[in-house]
Amino acid sequence: MYLPIFCIFLSVVDSLRILQIVPGFTNSHVLFNYRLAETLRFLGHDVKMWTQMEMAMLDTGNNKLPEGVSEYRIPIHFTDTLKTEGLKVFQSMMFESGDAHDLWWTGQEFKDMRVEACEQMLRHDESVYEDFRKDGFDVAIAHFHDLCPLAIAKKMNVKRVIWITHGTSIYEFSAVQLGLRTIPSTIPHPLSSAGFSQLFLDRVQNTLWHLSLLDFVNLPQNLLVDENLFYREFVGADQDDLWDLAKTTVPSLLINGDRMLDFPRPLPIHIAFSGELGVSKGKKLVMEKWLEDIIEKPSDGLIVFSLGTVSNTTNMPAQMINSFLGAFGKLKTYTILWRMEKSVAGAEKYENLHLVKWLPQKDIMRHPKMKLMIAHGGYNSFLEAAQAGIPAVLMPLFADQKINAKRAQRYGMATVLDKLDLTINNVYGAIKEALKPEYSTNAKKLSAMLSDQVARKPYSALRYSLKLATSPKPSLFTLKSQHLSFLEFHNLDIFSIVLLTAFIVCF
């Protein structure tokens, strides 16, 4: 009985032709996919990228296409001006409260954008699709923001697709496609601030977040229904729809991140954490002279304040700016680098404060003078701080950043700020707390934990997923629950018969 499984793992995945379907929503998405492509090239595979360009927010000048990788960029032009300007609206909203209506509105806009973008891509120049078909791809790797990548892969005659997440969380709509059901009582929702708490109110909040994804926030589950209705009209009722393709062409899911940084949860073998992606260049760290001159100034150490590549700091409210500025003014013995896209009135008064439009953040994190990271709680910043053993002050703005802050707090390496309750004293207090020795000690312990794992080949999860995706018998390791409805999965059909029988007998 073990022979078929043994044969699967005897087969060696040599050079594969891999199609990467990239959701070019943000600079962060593109950067992540470039790192993934670079890793695949390092493993000896041929990679071609299909990148959808939308909302005019990708080219910051910091991303470079990996050597040996080709990319086709398909422009998306929305008919609605509001959707074209969607990034600007979203970037201003993330500094605000984000009430229920804002979250619902964002979900509706995002849903319409995904369906329209999918239609444009599927109706794109047929000669381009023919060129992709000639490449004879073995497998596609795509982000699960919607189901359209399955349609694109099918049109290019790609038989297998690996889902990959952009963040380190599994949303309910992606988990269900792989036969995994989330348990709200024990598994924190990616958008919930409850974290790992199992108190009654926290479990209520967690459950409501899970239920809300039907028609809410930035990834509503009914998006998949609307997209599938369009696809059925596009290909005809006699063809497999997107739900069918999800069940027959997707054998595995990669979660972007390190398992140690997530909350514990049971996962089947075809769902795995990717670990760090990207190839270390092995070069000595060399800073640009202007940056090195700033860092090497005599001080108690370096503090970096950066809110990532998605948020536009020109939209930062005055209250937020003044709170941080005032707090930095009290930290005169530290050198502070503030990644900011506009000038800040009053910043010139502080010799220790330096405003810059861009930073090599990953390199700076490993500089010996680095003491503290102030960030929004994006996964990349969280991962970089954890790997470098640097404590953090996190101020979540949107999406999964609240849960990332909870992850960091769980290890005792971070303090957290509420973006709606900022004062000079609040910010200063959070920074001074995080600068205490115990936070640095905890951060270094976490860094050691990330390094001290079971010995394995580099990029083993990625290698393993490629093996599963190209296996001739994916049914050996995928879950049967992938093909069950909600009623069947929870045995509600059986319970209903039992209850009905009991009711008839008793009454």
Curated annotation (Swiss-Prot):
Topology term for the membrane: Single-pass membrane protein
Reactions catalysed: glucuronate acceptor + UDP-alpha-D-glucuronate = acceptor beta-D-glucuronoside + UDP + H(+)
Any one GO MF annotation of this record: UDP-glycosyltransferase activity
Signal peptide: 1-15
Matches recorded under PROSITE patterns: UDPGT (PS00375)
The UniProt record lists the keyword Signal: yes
Record: glycosylation sites: 312
Family matches, as Pfam families: UDPGT
Protein name: Putative UDP-glucuronosyltransferase ugt-60
Coarse class of the protein's main subcellular location: membrane
Family assignment from sequence similarity: Belongs to the UDP-glycosyltransferase family.
Keywords on record: Glycoprotein, Glycosyltransferase, Membrane, Signal, Transferase, Transmembrane, Transmembrane helix
TM region(s), chain numbering: 379-399
Record flagged with keyword Membrane: yes
PANTHER family given in the database record: EG:EG0003.4 PROTEIN-RELATED, UDP-GLUCURONOSYLTRANSFERASE UGT-60-RELATED
GO CC terms of this entry: membrane
The EC number(s) this enzyme carries: 2.4.1.17
Cellular compartment(s): Membrane
